[in-house]
Amino acid sequence: MSGIIATYLIHDDSHNLEKKAEQIALGLTIGSWTHLPHLLQEQLKQHKGNVIHVEELAAHEHTNSYLRKKVKRGIIKIEYPLLNFSPDLPAILTTTFGKLSLDGEVKLIDLTFSDELKKQFPGPKFGIDGIRNLLQVHDRPLLMSIFKGMIGRNIGYLKTQLRDQAIGGVDIVKDDEILFENALTPLTKRIVSGKEVLQSVYETYGHKTLYAVNLTGRTFDLKENAKRAVQAGADILLFNVFSYGLDVLQSLAEDDEIPLPIMAHPAVSGAYSASKLYGVSSPLLLGKLLRYAGADFSLFPSPYGSVALEKEEALAISKYLTEGDSFFKKSFSVPSAGIHPGFVPFIVRDFGKDVVINAGGGIHGHPNGAQGGGKAFRAAIDATLQNKPLHEVDDINLHSALQIWGNPSHEVKL
C-alpha cells in the first residue's frame, strides 16, 4: 500500500453494499469506469479507488426506526492512491470523506496510512516519555487540574488558584479552554505570574508543576502568539484544535521556534463525532489524527464522568494514542469530565499508568479546597498502585472526597 485505506460504516437503503462501495471508490477518485474506453482506463487505473473489503453487519431495528426506512448496515474499506492527493490532512480528509460526508448515513471509522505517508507527519514533539522527563515522574499516572471560574477574575486570583493546586500535588494545571486573551489575564502575564508561583512552590515543597496556557487568537496570529508564550517561559500550550483544524496543529508542532508540548482540547469535536451514523469516529479524530498531527496530550470524555463516552470508544482513542509505532512518539491519554478520586482505580485499570488523571470540580470542590482536592487524588493514585482499596486508606482528604462523591471503585481489582 502506498496511499491510504479508509474504513466506513454505511447504512444503505438500496441494500447493495458492493455497489455502494464501488460508487464511493469511483466518486472520490476518477468519477466513472465501466463506460471509459480501454486506453483511458489504462491511463487512469493508477488513480482509481479500489474497494478492498465489504462486510455486511446485522440489521439494527433501532437504526431503521430512527431513519424511518430499512437499511443494510456494513463496513467497507477503500484504498486511495497516494498519486491522487498531496500528503497533508486537508487533502486526505477531502479525498476520503469530503463530499461523501454529505451523502447520507456514512461514517468515517478509520484511516490507515502507508509508511510513506506517515513520514509526512510530525507526531508528538515530546510524547509520554518527554513529558515524564520534564516532570521527573516516571512511576505513576500524572495528575492534572483546571483553572475554574477565571473569566472576569484578575491575576491575583489566578496565582492563588495555581498555588493551591500545585501545593496539593498536581503535576499539570491547565487554563480553561474558554479563557481567551483579555485585559485582566493576558497571555504573557499569566505565564510570567504562573512561573513565579510554581517556582516558589517548588523551592518550598519540592514539587514541580507545569502550567498549560491556552493558545488563542486568529489563525494567522497563532504562531506569533505561541512564540510570545515561548519567550515568556511557557511550559505547555493548550490548543482548541477543532476550532482551527488539524493542519493548524501540525503547523504548530512542526515549528522549531515553538519547542513546547501541545495539549489538544476536544472542544467542537462533538459536532464531528457524536453521531453513530454520520461524521468521523472519536478514535480516529481524538486518537490517531491528533497523534499524527503532533499532540502530546489528547483530552477526551472518560467512560465514567459527567460527559461520558462509551468505554469501547474511549479505550480505542487511548489505543491509537499509545500503541507502538516506529514513526511516532506516544501521546498521553487524558480521559476527562466529572472525574473524582473514587474513579482513580477505574482509570488506572482501564488506561494503565501512562495516563493523565484530569479533574476540575473533583479538586476545587473539596471541602479543604484545591490543596485538599489534589492531595485526595494523590492518595487515591498511591493506593491504587499498591492495589489497596480506597476506603482502607488513612488519609483525611481522600476520606472527605469519598464521602462527598462516593466510592464507585469499592470492588475494583487491578
UniProtKB/Swiss-Prot annotation:
| Residue list for modification N6-carboxylysine | 174
Q: What is its EC number?
A: 5.3.2.5
Report the InterPro entries cross-referenced here: Diketo-Methiopentyl-P_enolase, RuBisCO, RuBisCO_lsu_C, RuBisCO_lsu_C_sf, RuBisCO_lsu_fd_N, RuBisCO_lsu_N_sf
- Can you tell me which residues form the catalytic site? 99
Keyword check for Isomerase, yes or no: yes
Which GO terms of type biological process are on file? carbon fixation; L-methionine salvage from methylthioadenosine
Q: Which cofactor does it need?
A: Mg(2+)
Query: Would you say which domain of life the source belongs to?
Result: Bacteria
- Assembly with partners or alone: Homodimer.
What NCBIfam families does the annotation carry? PRK09549.1, salvage_mtnW
Per the similarity annotation, which family is this? Belongs to the RuBisCO large chain family. Type IV subfamily.
What is the protein name for this chain?
2,3-diketo-5-methylthiopentyl-1-phosphate enolase
- According to its UniProt entry, this protein's organism is Bacillus cereus (strain ATCC 10987 / NRS 248)
